[in-house]
Amino acid sequence: DGAFELNMIGQDTTNWGRDIGDDRGLVGLLTELNNTVARHGSGWVRLMYAYPTNFDDEMIDTIASLDHIAKYIDIPLQHMSDNMLTAMRRGLLRKEQEDLMYRLRERIPGLAIRTTFITGFPGETEDDHQQLLEFVREFQFDMMGVFKYSHEDGTVAATMEDDPKLRVPEEVKERREEELMLAQQEVAWANADYLAEEGAVFDVLIDEREHQREVTEEDVALPTYQGRCYHQAPEVDSITLVASKHELAPGELVRCRIVGAAEYDLIARPVSDLERSTSLPVLGGSSGGCSA
């Protein structure tokens, strides 16, 4: 039907098929999806909500080897303190999660990792929070979200929260959330600036025309579009603003050079717009003068 992108979403995509007796598992599903996309020509499949539990080497090798599986994983870790991981009944401890994160980066070149954490879970101490904060600064996730724990009736956590000694005050939750997001902001903004400084080239999937922000070249406003590189999932991650001299269409894949950054977002120009027609040998290229 002309779709270019497929986002796999579920409560736990890592363990896909186990509840319905499908022996293919996630590896088999990814392989079949990759082959289907290949038969249709182009596109990418993005893995979301992949729990770290049971994420084994075969899955890592499969993602690394398949051309149409985006080198992007959304893997909710929830915390990095053993105390909290045990209370949350996550089934893994910090060392296991940490080893998996570094193994993913080592064995899948160019992999973008997104994760989510919960702050203020009943019983979370300041030491638990500091362990998480330190890991966020150390590992430097490509994308990250933080959620404040909220009460859900009928859950074990809700029972824990009934104990005043375990309940985390709302103002403490807010402070911890802010500290985590500021740490991630520093990482994300630096990454965006680096890609702009290097003039990195990516294929950008165009989503829609951008009407709120404009990019100018020599004081002339260029038509601007919202798009995403492979490392940007829809709705939850940053975007790439593409300023083009030519009209672009949603669903179009455009090779672009990153020429600027606006906090989390990237600013790009189509490579074809930046090329100069000349019969002389030229080394390097020009990115034009762009501002947002």
Residue ranges of each PLM-predicted region?
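Proteins enriched for Cys/Gly/acidic motifs involved in redox and nucleic-acid/cofactor modification
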Residues: 1-16, 73, 96-106, 130, ...
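Conserved SAM/AdoMet-binding glycine-rich loop
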Residues: 3-129, 137-138
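Short acidic/polar active-site loop segments enriched in Thr and Asp
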Residues: 4, 43, 142, 147, ...
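Short, glycine-/Ser/Thr-/acidic-enriched flexible segments
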Residues: 13, 52, 119-120, 151, ...
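Short beta-alpha junctions and helix-cap segments that line functional grooves
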Residues: 59-60, 132, 242-244
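Hydrophobic, well-ordered secondary-structure elements that form the walls
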Residues: 75, 116, 136, 144, ...
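Terminal RNA-binding accessory module
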Residues: 160-292
